[in-house]
Amino acid sequence: MLGGLAKAIFGSSNDRYVKSLRPILQKIAGFEPTLEAMNDEELAAQTVKFRQRLDAGETLDSLLPEAFATVREAARRVLGQRHYDVQMIGGIVLHRGEIAEMRTGEGKTLVATLAVYLNALPGEGVHVVTVNDYLATRDAEWMGRVYRFLGLTVGVIVPNLSDQERRDAYGADITYGTNNEFGFDYLRDNMKYDRALMVHRPFNFAVVDEVDSVLIDEARTPLIISGPTDDKSELYMQVDAIVKQVTKDDYEFDEKQRSVVLTEDGTERIERLLEAAGLLEGGNLYAYENTQVVHHLNQALRANVAFKRDTDYIVKDEKIIIIDEFTGRMMDGRRWSDGLHQAVEAKEGVKIEPENQTLASITFQNYFRMYPKLGGMTGTAATEAHEFYQIYKMNVVTIPTNLPVKRIDQDDEFYKNMLDKFAAITQAIREAKERGQPVLVGTVSIEKSELLSEFLTKEKVEHKVLNARYHEQEAHIVAQAGRLGAVTIATNMAGRGTDIQLGGNLEFRMLDEHPALEIGTPEFDAAAERIRGEIIAEKEAVLAAGGLFVLGTERHESRRIDNQLRGRSGRQGDPGLSRFYLSLDDDLLRIFGPQTMFARMMNKNLADGEAIVSPWISKAIETAQKKVEARNYDIRKQVVEYDDVMNDQRKVIYEQRADIMDAETVDDVVTDMRADTANAIVGGCCPPHSYPEQWDVDTLKLRSAETLGITPPFDEWIEQDGIDPEILAEKVLAEADAVIAAKRATIDDQSWHGIEKSVLLQTLDHHWKEHLATLDALRQVIHLRAYAQKTPINEYKHEAFALFERMLVAIREEVTRVLAHVRFEMAPQDYAELPPMPDFVTEHVNALTGEDNSGDRDGGTLGIIGSRVPQAIAAPAGDDFEITPEIAATLGRNSLCPCGSGRKYKHCHGAL
C-alpha cells in the first residue's frame, strides 16, 4: 500500500527516468529550424560533418541531439514520416544500450533509425537483428532509404548468399539480418582456415528487434553447426515399430517435463519385443551392451508420446518441419538433435536423415553478450525485466504511447470444456461480424487453429486461417485482418511483425486488385487514390464498430505472448477490445493449473454452455503462468551457467585459431609442442628419481616411433653412465628435431610453414569437435552428482577444465605425430590448388538445428583451406605401413591414422 502511495505521489522509477530525457528532446527540437532550411545535398552532408567532428574528438553523446534531428528531418523528406517525441525517447534508450518497451503500432522500426544512424557514424558497423528474413529484407529496404539519403551504406544478410555477398553486407555501415544468420556466420568464421575467407566484422553495436523473442524465448536453443555421422536409419525404424506396440499402462508421461519413463511392466514388454527382434543383448534392457538401443528407445518414446503432429511439428513434402512454440512459425531447415528428429521421422514414416555431430556451438546469450553495446525493442519486456538485467545487464524502459490506449481488456470467460468454449467463441465472432467489427482469433497451435476453423466452417462463418502451413501469406493476411467484418484465425505468428491496419492496407490491396499497374504511372496513381479513399471510409466504419476485437482461445504459458496478442488491437489510440475464452481442457490449466479448485467451481451449479467470469480465475491463471515462466527462467539461467564454462574455453580456442591464421609462421609453436610431447613421453615411461631398470623401455620405444617418428638406440643410451630421464628426454628431442629438419630440407620454407599451419588448425578443429561432444555427454549426466551431495555446476566446471587440459595435450601430441610422419609424393608446387569445402556441413539449433543451404560457400570447415596451403598435408604411405596390435591399442577410432595419410584411423588402416 505504501509503495503504491509513493508511486502515485512521486511516480515510478521508469516515469522519472523518461522525464529525465525531456531536456534532450528540447535540444533536438532546437536544431530543427536550421535543418528544415537545408536543401537535400546540405542535409546529406551532415554525415560527413559528424564524422569529422568524431575524428576531432567529439563523442557520440555530444552529437546525439543534432544527429537525431538530422534523421528526423531525413525521414520526413524520404518516408513522409516524422518521429514523435516518444520515438525520440526510444532512440535515446537504444543508444544507451537499454531495452525500449513500446506498444504495438508505436513505430519501433522507425525508432531504430535514430540509434542506428548515430552509432554507424564511426564506421565500425551496426547490426540490426530481426526475427525473420522477411522483416530483415523489408526493413533494410524501407529504412535503408533514410540511411542512403544520408550517405550511409546498408547490407542485408539472408540465406543462400555467397561468402563474398556476406562480406559485402557486413562491410556496410548498417547490416540487417536475423539472429540465426548473424550467429551462424560467427561460428562458420571460426571454422575457416584463412582470415581472408571470414565474413563477420568485429562486434560493435547491435539493435535487436523483438528482443524478448531473441534473447529470452530462443535462449534455450544453442546455435550448433554439425556434420554427419554414421547412418542408423534401420535401427530407428525397428525401435519405432516396437514402441508403437506399447500401451499407456507401459509408461509414465510427465507433460511438464516432456519426459516418458517405462513402468516395470513396460520394461518387461519392451525386453520381450526387443529380444524377438534380435536387438537385445545380455538379457537385460539396461545391460551395458544395450546402451545404444536404450538411447534410441528413449527418443522413440518421446517422439511417439510427447511430441504431437501439428503442434510441435508438421509433415510437409515428406519432411518433418519444427514449429516454433513461441511464434507458431515453421522453422524450416532446423532439426532436433541427439537423435530426436530421426525418431520423429521414423514415427511419421518419412525418410530418415543421418544424425549429426557438433562441430561448433554457441548460445544466443553468449553471442549477444560479445557486443560492447546492445540495445533492444519490443512491445513486451517488463515481465522479464529481471532476467534482462541479470543475464544481459540491460534495463527495460517503458516508453509512453504517443496517444492514450483506448483498448478495453475484458475479463476471461471460463467454460467447462472445449466444445462449450468453441460454441461461445463462434457466437462472439458472429455478433462481431454482424456489426462489422474485425476479429483476430489467437490459437496456440496449428491443430487448434484448424479445429476451430472446421467448427466455424460448419457454422457457416466466413474466415481466413493463418498458421505455419500458410506462412507465405502471413504479411498479406495480417495486413488485411483489420478490414470491415474480417475474421482471421491465427497462431502466435500473428503477434509480431506486420501491423494490422484498420480498414485495410493500401500496398496489399494494390497488389491484389491492380497487380499489372506500374508504380509512377497515372493509372497507378489514380487507382491508389481511389483505394486510399475507400480505406479511409472503411476505417471509419471499423472504428464505429469498436475497432479490432482480439479473441484468445486459451492462455499461453508466457504472459508476454498473451500481451503480444492483445497488443495487436488499439494501436495509435484506436479503440479495440480483447477477451480470452478458457476451458478446463486448455493445456496450461490442465498441466499447471490448480485442477481440483477449477473442477469444484465447474461442477457447482454450472449448466452446459454457461461461463464463469471471475477475477479469482484470472488470478489463478496468472499464478500458473508465473510458475511456468519461473521454471523456464531457471532453465535458461542454467543453460547460460553451463555454456559460460564452454564459452571461456571457446574464446581460448577461437583466439588461438585467429593467432595461428595471422602468424606468418607457427614454427615456434610446433617446436614447443614437439618438446612438450617428447618430455611427456619420456616422463611417462621414466619417472623422476627412478633407476633405468625401472623404466618402461618397450612403451618408450613404441610411443617414440608412433608419435615422434624415431627409432633411436634406446638400449645403448640406457647403458650409458649417468643417464637419467632429463638427459634421455634431451636425446629423444634431438632425434625428433633431426627427423623434422630432414623433412624440411626437401621442400621450401613457404610450403613447410603452410603445412605446419594446416596441420595445427585441422588438429585443433578435430579435437575441439570431439571435446564438444564430450562436454555435451558430461552435461547430460552431471546432475547425478547431486545425489552425492555435490553441486552439479561446480562439478561440471571442474570436470570441463580437466577435459580441456587433456584436449590440449592431445592436440600437442597429434600435431607432433602428423608432422613426424608426413611424406611428400609430388612436387610442392603441385600443392597450390585448394580443395572445396565439403558441402555436407549442416547447422543445428539445440535441440533445434538449422541447416545452411547456401551450398556455394568459399569457406572451409573440414578440408585444408588457405591461400598458400598445400592441398594434401600428408601423402598416403601405402599398404606397406603396418599397424601392430600395440599401436592399435593406443589409437581411438577418430584419431588420425599414424601411416601419414591424413585420414581418420577408422577410415584408413583401422577400417573394418
From Swiss-Prot:
Pfam families: P-loop_SecA, SEC-C, SecA_DEAD, SecA_PP_bind, SecA_SW. ATP binds at Q87, G105, E106, G107, K108, T109, D499. It is a peripheral membrane protein. It catalyses: ATP + H2O + cellular proteinSide 1 = ADP + phosphate + cellular proteinSide 2. It comes from Rhizorhabdus wittichii (strain DSM 6014 / CCUG 31198 / JCM 15750 / NBRC 105917 / EY 4224 / RW1). Its cofactor is Zn(2+). Zn(2+) binds at C897, C899, C908, H909. GO terms for molecular function: ATP binding; metal ion binding; protein-exporting ATPase activity. This is Protein translocase subunit SecA. Keywords: ATP-binding, Cell inner membrane, Cell membrane, Cytoplasm, Membrane, Metal-binding, Nucleotide-binding, Protein transport, Translocase, Translocation, Transport, Zinc. It comes from the Bacteria. Part of the Sec protein translocase complex. Interacts with the SecYEG preprotein conducting channel. Has a central role in coupling the hydrolysis of ATP to the transfer of proteins into and across the cell membrane, serving both as a receptor for the preprotein-SecB complex and as an ATP-driven molecular motor driving the stepwise translocation of polypeptide chains across the membrane. May bind 1 zinc ion per subunit. It is found in: Cell inner membrane; Cytoplasm. CDD domains: DEXDc_SecA, SF2_C_secA. GO terms for cellular component: cell envelope Sec protein transport complex; cytosol; plasma membrane. Its EC number is 7.4.2.8. Monomer and homodimer. Part of the essential Sec protein translocation apparatus which comprises SecA, SecYEG and auxiliary proteins SecDF-YajC and YidC. HAMAP family: SecA (MF_01382).
